[in-house]
């Protein structure tokens, strides 16, 4: 089931598990391996050739009253990095980064 990519993300030093069309958030301290089809990576090791326009398919359990609400352990660049760099790490072209505040990311 496809959902619009619209959620609040908080900066973190933890990593997440990502596949091209699916996202599973996991805790770095978790002992559980990623589900089949997912591979774990650090946000500091994103390949430069990554296609940042991929679509996300979220688990229906993240749906709440018709709105998607989820917390992602996403590592964002600090304020010294350019907005374009922030967008690449966030995986979108419309990211807004404010220190100590949630980041709103909308799929364009």
Swiss-Prot record:
Name by which UniProt lists this protein: Putative uncharacterized protein CCDC28A-AS1
Gene (name only): CCDC28A-AS1
